[in-house]
Structures are given as C-alpha cells and as structure tokens.
Amino acid sequence: MLKSCFKKYTYAQEKACSPIETIERALKKLNQTEKPILKEILRIDDLDRIGIPVYLCKVEEGISKRLGVGDSFGKGITPEQAEASALMELVERYSNFSFLLNANPLVDSYINLKGNTIPMEALLASLHSVFRENSFIEKLKNIKLRWVEAYDLIESKKVIFPLYWFYRIYGTTGWAAGNTLEEATLQALCEIIERHCISTIMEERLEVPTIEIDSIENPLIKDSLKKILSSGIEVFIKDFSLDLGVSTVAIIAYDPLAPTLSLRVYGAAGTHPNPNMALIRAITELVQHRAQVLYREFILNKPGGPTFCFLKFKDLEDAKFLLNGEKIPFNHLSSFSHPDFKVEIEYILDKLLKKGLKAYLVETTHPVLGISSVMVNIPGARLNRPSTKLHPYLLIARQLMDIGYYKEAFFYIEKAFEEAPSYKKLPQILSQAATCAKLAGEYKKSMEYYENLLEIYPQLMGSSKFVNEFISIVESVFADFNFKA
C-alpha cells in the first residue's frame, strides 16, 4: 500500500512538496466541493508577543454543524508553513469526519465474521488492565460493531477493523492529511507516539531527563528558542522518548507575565525519528497552543486549557516532577533520518513491534478533495483522555447506541452502573444514560437520570435545550402511565 516517497522540502520540516504548493492545492480543492468548506483564514499570532506564526482556518457554519468539524489551527517556523499546516488540518478533519459519516461499514459481531479481523484482545488493549479479562473479551465477541477495511502496517496485509470502536476511545489521535499517503502516515504515527509518551509520563508522573539547552546546535532551533526566551518565558526541554527508540521532545514553559493563568505553566511536545524535527514540532506546538488559548479566552470568551494529554499546572511546584531528572546533551537522543518517508515509517514500525504494538491504517482520502488523508490506530497506545478509563460496558453501550440498538445499549449502561456506581456521579455519563433510556422507551429511568443529573449539575436549568428535553421526558412518563392505566 505504501510506496517509496522522497522528501522534496526540508526547511524546518520534511514534506513531499513546498508549503506554497500545499497552500495552492489545498485552497483550490477546498473550493471545489458542492458547498464551501473554508470561511476564512487568519494569522492570529499577533495576539501573542513571541513572533512565531500561527494560522486559523474558520469553517463554514453549515459544514461545522453537519460534520462536527471545528476551526483548525496551523503552526510552523515560516508563515507559509503555518498557513499550510492550518489548511491541511482542515482537510484532515473534513476528510475523516466525512468518512465516518459515509463509510457504509459492515455491521456484525466478531463471532459471525469469517474475514481477516484483528484479535479481539486488541479492542481492550487501550483500557485499564482490569478490563482486559477474558469475560469482557467473550462478551465483546457477540456485540455488533462497525467494521471497515484497514491495512496492517506491520504485516502488510488488509484486515477488517472496528474503526468506530477505536474512534470512541482515541478520538482524532492518529488522524493526518499530507501531500502524499506516506507523508500523512508518518505524521499520524508520530502523533500517536507523541501522545502515548506524554500520557505515560503525566499519568505516572515520571521523572525524565532534562536536555541541556546549550547543547542544541541547530541554528533554526536556537533562533526560535531565542524568540521565546527573549519574551520573558523560561523553558525546560525534556526527553519524553521513554524506551520506544523514537525521539519525543517536550518543552515545559513558565511565563511569569502570562496574560492568562492558562499559560502560566504548560507543556508541548513533538515526535519524529529525527530529534531536530521533534524539537521544532514541540516549539511550534508550544507557540500554537498559546495562540489558541488567547484566541479562545480573549476573542471567543471561552475557557482555555492545557495542551492535549498534558496535566493542568497552576504553578511550577505543580510541575516539579517534570523539572527534575538527569541532564543530558541533545545529541544523546536516538536519531534516524532518511530521505524516503517509507523508510522512516518502517523504522518506526520496527520500534513499535519490539514493544508488542501494531499499527493499522485506514485511508480516508475524500473523493472530491483528493488530498491524502488517513486514520492510524495503534491498539495499546496510551492516551490521557477520559475515554481510555471507561468501563468496557459503557463503550459497548456507545457502540450500540450509534447503530440504533437502544435497548441493548441501555442494558450495558445499567450493568456498568451496577459494577461501578461512581459513574452515576459523572454528568456526561448520566446524560448519555438518560438519552439512551429515553430512546429505549424507558421513560421513568430516563427521568430518574435527568433528575440525578440536575442534582449534580444544577446549572443545566439555564439551558433551554435541557429544560425542553426534561419536559419531554416528563410528558412521556405521564403518557405512558395513562396508556397503561
């Protein structure tokens, strides 16, 4: 499936063509769809004081509502790189959400499938170890899931893959668009590894090596760091690679002059076989996150938060475990570079296989856009996200709800509440339970869960949507009672 593909642009990033070519192609394709996708593209780093470019693509409202595609952001050392990055993120999101909506997957249980499926154990590999028991695996074998054709990157063969199961766990992690399929695949693999390493370190609060800034020799990196440091921001550069053999570099930033508390102490990271590329990604990610937070808080009046998978830090004391660790020179990081994307992909796959991990690729290139887009999944990769901590019964319920099996879904929600009553204290889970109960015709149960939800989160009474939904349930309960009477 993957072919030899050589890099043709290597200034601060490695691509199959120049950013200018990417911009021209993306803009042309985004304007060829039946309804416009891109509303406008803006440079937003003027909200900050660093001077490294960040771009924002605003999505047409109709597309946003229909597909759930939000605004996309882009980063880079040059304005052209940042603009191309924002456009390609929009291509990625539009292509992949369109694929999820229109893929026409095979709906069946594992036990009925005679094709080349992935092992059922892989479906639980991303969850807590207590949920990987045979009892859960056996139940899962009989659940109807949605399957699509994927490509096993390790064994180089087609398989039947439960994409929607993993989407509910990993979200958009492992999504990428690129100038070629190989460029997109490498980017997707690096993102998964990056978030796996961040999540492992955050969840276990691991102490990892600190990279000596003076040991960094790349002039582009030194110039970018100078812009950050001269803005009064202190940085700590960390080796987040763990033992995977692929460089993951993180930056912890401390800004005593931060315009918002969300940016007082925060982190960002980057992964690439070439540590210079990994660190450049971490730098541009750090700057992009600042611009995103400032845009959300000061333009949209919405709360900002930590970078994806990172913990929220109030101050440096909160992040103390990240400031410790032995000091090492930058050239101690594992390093591999090759002019062919395919060779670098094979290098990463070999490192993953040594850790017992496999990667699966679903090509999602949109038929109108024609720009390579992928969803890559690595079952067992860690992600510091609530969905990876859910009881399997709740994940099963979500899958069944998605295909309209509401009574079966409600059964598993109730089973999850029996085994773990603490879920009844989580607003999002209660809301899902109330909705599922209503759709299953269990109106009394639905009303009970809505009442519990109000006790936990009374602010919902300020939502007209919630109030109307609650009134609808009450009316259904009384109608059901009168019918039976």
Where are these regions (language model features)?
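Helix-biased "structured C-terminal domain" signature
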Residues: M1-A485
